[in-house]
């Protein structure tokens, strides 16, 4: 399974032909170099010239990805906005990717989370694993959601952290040309079975509704004064159930 997972990750990086860009501080919005979140390029761009060679071992590859994830998590802590002022939104830098083509897989951190869940399940006994399988227990999501990669051409505008409307730029200039901005969005499924209310809620006592919520990610944008820079914008990242109690019964 480890080899299969690493193969998936190699394919994930291989389909992204993005050039590495210089990192800058979050406050340096005038610089077009992408801060914090890295582009997904070849293995050579991630870990030097030797990382892309065919002689790369499984151990060194795993160390490479572990190092990348640690840097992403460290950067996430550095640029996280004041949580007291933004309690209604989180920061998901892993949902943004710069690429020359549509990504074929979910964000890398999502794949790592699935892999972690597999390892946890592998440590269970057969009986415990069988009974912990959501499909066997008949578990269903409270709200049906869909996730997909979208481009700035789909979004066009977004709301930044100050509440202003900014234009999301479709392409980002790099040393060897331009790359498109892709955003991994999750929202409530309008064609799902929960469009009339949350699943499993007692309708005699509660009013329920599945609602799409948003989080902050960083993207290259242009404000109303034509100033281009990296800003935090809101994108759809989850589908949650909201409840209100029925009164007058």
From Swiss-Prot:
State the conditions that upregulate or repress this gene: Expression oscillates in a circadian manner in the suprachiasmatic nucleus (SCN) of the brain. Expressed at higher levels during the dark period and at lower levels during the light period. Up-regulated after sciatic nerve injury.
For this protein, the record's Pfam families field holds: NGF
Task: Report keywords, A-Z.
Answer: Cleavage on pair of basic residues, Disulfide bond, Glycoprotein, Growth factor, Secreted, Signal
Tissues expressing this chain:
Expressed in the dorsal root ganglion and the spinal cord (at protein level). Detected in brain, especially in brain cortex, hippocampus, midbrain and cerebellum.
- What is the protein named? Neurotrophic factor BDNF precursor form
Annotated disulfide bonds? 143-210, 188-239, 198-241
Query: What is the documented function of this protein?
Result: Important signaling molecule that activates signaling cascades downstream of NTRK2. During development, promotes the survival and differentiation of selected neuronal populations of the peripheral and central nervous systems. Participates in axonal growth, pathfinding and in the modulation of dendritic growth and morphology. Major regulator of synaptic transmission and plasticity at adult synapses in many regions of the CNS.
What does UniProt say on post-translational modification here?
Mature BDNF is produced by proteolytic removal of the propeptide, catalyzed by a FURIN family member. In addition, the precursor form is proteolytically cleaved within the propeptide, but this is not an obligatory intermediate for the production of mature BDNF. Can be converted into mature BDNF by plasmin (PLG).
Task: Name the gene.
Answer: Bdnf
Q: Where is this site: Cleavage?
A: 59-60
Where in or outside the cell it occurs: the entry states: Secreted
Alphabetical list of InterPro entries matching this protein: Brain-der_neurotrophic_factor, Cystine-knot_cytokine, Nerve_growth_factor-like, Nerve_growth_factor-rel, Nerve_growth_factor_CS
State which residues form the propeptide: 19-130
Subunit: Monomers and homodimers. Binds to NTRK2/TRKB. Can form heterodimers with other neurotrophin family members, such as NTF3 and NTF4 (in vitro), but the physiological relevance of this is not clear. BDNF precursor form: interacts with the heterodimer formed by NGFR and SORCS2. Mature BDNF has much lower affinity for the heterodimer formed by NGFR and SORCS2.
- By its UniProt entry, which PANTHER family does this protein fall under? BRAIN-DERIVED NEUROTROPHIC FACTOR (PTHR11589:SF3), NERVE GROWTH FACTOR NGF -RELATED (PTHR11589)
**Any one of the GO CC terms:** extracellular space
Positions annotated with a glycan in the UniProt record: 123
Q: Does the keyword Endoplasmic reticulum apply?
A: no
Q: Which residues form the signal peptide?
A: 1-18
One GO term under biological process is: positive regulation of nuclear receptor-mediated glucocorticoid signaling pathway
* UniProt xrefs under SUPFAM superfamilies: Cystine-knot cytokines
Its main subcellular localisation, reduced to a broad class, is secreted
- Provide the GO MF annotations for this entry: growth factor activity; neurotrophin TRKB receptor binding
Q: Does the keyword Disulfide bond apply?
A: yes
What does a knockout show?
Mutant mice are smaller than wild-type littermates, and most die during the second week after birth. They exhibit impaired motor coordination and balance, head bobbing and tilting, and spinning during perionds of hyperactivity. Mutant mice display a strongly reduced number of neurons in the dorsal root ganglion, trigeminal ganglion, mesencephalic trigeminal nucleus, vestibular ganglion and nodose ganglion. Cell death of vestibular ganglion neurons is strongly increased 14 days after birth. The number of facial motor neurons and sympathetic superior cervical ganglion neurons are not decreased.
